[in-house]
């Protein structure tokens, strides 16, 4: 179960940079697990900003890469673009600070999280998410203890999630259902 929580924490932290969403859809008791920088980004969004993000998310399959998506964002809102780049740079700096094994693991989690997004940008396939979680858990379990500790230190929300009993139960239940 410990490994499931690490996976969910990593995916949650990373997907905040990958997938536009509204913090209003998240229960207050879980918001504390979202990095402050991510919360601040979403708190500062106007209704127009959210609409721009939804529009771009629905077209995500048309962008060759993250830079192309950011350029499209810049065309729609320079302010939103600057805020998104700031958030991206924050996450990138954390990832770049990792040693090679930890960085490779996080890069793989990011790639897997991005692959879970549907072409229309709307719905997730729960079975694919569960399989991705199982695959990443297996890869996490294969990491050495030093790498696991580095991930916890670099991404503090992970440590919070690991110690939360309610989230442990939720993660276990989610991954057991078929």
UniProtKB/Swiss-Prot annotation:
Q: Which UniProt keywords apply?
A: Coiled coil, Lipid-binding, Retinol-binding, Secreted, Signal, Vitamin A
Instruction: Indicate the secretion signal residues.
Output: 1-16
Instruction: Please provide one cellular component term from the Gene Ontology annotations of this protein.
Output: extracellular region
* Record-level Gene Ontology MF annotations: fatty acid binding; retinal binding; retinol binding
Q: Does the keyword Signal apply?
A: yes
Q: Which InterPro entries match?
A: Gp-FAR-1
Q: Cellular location of this protein?
A: Secreted
Coiled-coil-forming residues are 67-89, 129-154
Decide whether keyword Lyase is in the record: no
Pfam entry (one): Gp-FAR-1
In what way is this protein post-translationally modified? Not glycosylated.
Please state which protein family the record places this protein in. Belongs to the fatty-acid and retinol-binding protein (FARBP) family.
Q: According to its UniProt entry, what is the function of this protein? A: Binds retinol and different fatty acids.
The protein, known as: Fatty-acid and retinol-binding protein 1
Organism of this sequence: Loa loa
């Amino acid at each position: 179960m410990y490994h499931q929580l690490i996976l969910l924490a990593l995916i949650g932290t990373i997907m905040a940079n990958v997938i536009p969403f509204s913090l209003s859809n998240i229960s207050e008791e879980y918001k504390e697990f979202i990095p402050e920088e991510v919360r601040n980004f979403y708190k500062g969004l106007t209704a127009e900003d959210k609409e721009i993000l939804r529009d771009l998310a629905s077209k995500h399959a048309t962008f060759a890469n993250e830079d192309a998506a950011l350029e499209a964002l810049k065309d729609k809102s320079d302010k939103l673009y600057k805020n998104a780049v700031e958030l991206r740079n924050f996450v990138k700096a954390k990832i770049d600070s990792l040693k090679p094994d930890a960085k490779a693991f996080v890069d793989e989690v990011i790639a897997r999280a991005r692959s879970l997004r549907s072409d229309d940008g709307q719905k997730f396939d729960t079975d694919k998410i569960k399989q991705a979680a199982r695959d990443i858990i297996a890869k996490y379990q294969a990491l050495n203890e030093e790498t696991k500790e580095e991930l916890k230190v670099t991404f503090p929300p992970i440590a919070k999630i690991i110690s939360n009993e309610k989230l442990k139960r939720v993660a276990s239940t989610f991954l057991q259902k078929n």
